[in-house]
């Protein structure tokens, strides 16, 4: 029994060391899995307590303070290591989560949104919108070129992809983690966001033909970008009648 718990303690210490190393090397991925990591951490406590209780059933009543000490130790490690908490008031032992990093990330996101919005406004005022009409393919070509022009200025990649046949659907989703799930969402006309925030797929229909607007980025693509680029398609429609009247 003693040997078992000694091995378990050293495994936990090794696991904590691995966690610290992973945080240095793969900080973003570790943050994504933080909820699962913390659940695993407390599961280890429960398993250890159950093993000890199995061999010493009366210990829960005669040595309950041992359970309490270990539980507090797990909670403190969770607070200081996993939640990056620090002591705010030494006398009151008050703990709070360090939110500085979160605020910095939010500030960066805000600046990114503002820069993209400014670029969007500048392009609308200074870049001509060339309209293609006469057929569905011509209209789609015009939309595709418009999206690519704006995306290039915003450090994004945009394309209008065919999505009518099963071959089109398979081609679009072949590199996705779960192609069937992505296709199901797009068939329901739901916007798809990948779990890493790098890809957004937006269902788009031109008369009887189905398309998907694909937005990708090396940094992040959000609902904000989805709204900007879908508004471009509406602007394109507003310009189209003017061009047609001019031809008449």
From Swiss-Prot:
Predominant location: membrane
Binding partners and assembly: Probably forms an oligomer; X-ray data suggests the inactive complex forms a heterotetramer of SpoIISA(2)-SpoIISB(2), which inactivates the toxic activity of SpoIISA.
Membrane topology annotation: Multi-pass membrane protein
Disulfide bond sites: none
Stored InterPro entries: SpoIISA_toxin (IPR025940)
Pfam families in alphabetical order: SpoIISA_toxin
Keyword Iron: no
Extracellular topological segments: 1-3, 65-67
Signals that turn on the gene: Expressed at low levels during exponential growth, it increases dramatically at the onset of sporulation (at protein level). A member of the spoIISA-spoIISB operon.
Gene from which this protein is expressed: spoIISA
Protein name as annotated: Stage II sporulation protein SA
One GO CC term on file: plasma membrane
Segments on the Cytoplasmic face: 22-41, 88-248
Intracellular or extracellular location(s): Cell membrane
């Amino acid at each position: 029994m003693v040997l078992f718990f000694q091995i378990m303690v050293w495994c936990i210490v090794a696991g904590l060391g691995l966690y610290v190393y992973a945080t240095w090397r793969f900080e973003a991925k570790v943050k994504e899995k933080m909820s699962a990591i913390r659940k695993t951490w407390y599961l280890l406590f429960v398993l250890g307590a159950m093993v000890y209780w199995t061999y010493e059933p009366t210990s829960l009543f005669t040595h309950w303070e041992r359970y309490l000490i270990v539980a507090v130790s797990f909670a403190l490690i969770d607070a200081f290591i996993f939640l990056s908490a620090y002591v705010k008031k030494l006398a009151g032992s008050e703990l709070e989560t360090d939110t500085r990093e979160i605020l910095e990330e939010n500030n960066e996101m805000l600046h990114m949104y503002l820069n993209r919005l400014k670029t969007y406004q500048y392009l609308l005022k200074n870049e001509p919108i060339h309209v293609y009409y006469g057929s569905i393919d011509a209209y789609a070509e015009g939309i595709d070129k418009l999206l690519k022009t704006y995306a290039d200025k915003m450090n994004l990649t945009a394309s209008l992809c065919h999505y009518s046949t099963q071959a089109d659907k398979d081609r679009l989703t072949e590199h996705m983690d779960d192609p069937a799930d992505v296709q199901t969402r797009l068939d329901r006309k739901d916007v798809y966001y990948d779990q890493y925030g790098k890809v957004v797929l937006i269902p788009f229909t031109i008369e009887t033909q189905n398309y998907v607007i694909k937005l990708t980025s090396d940094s992040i693509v959000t609902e904000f970008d989805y709204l900007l680029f879908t508004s471009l398609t509406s602007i394109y429609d507003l310009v189209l009648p003017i061009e047609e009247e001019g031809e008449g």
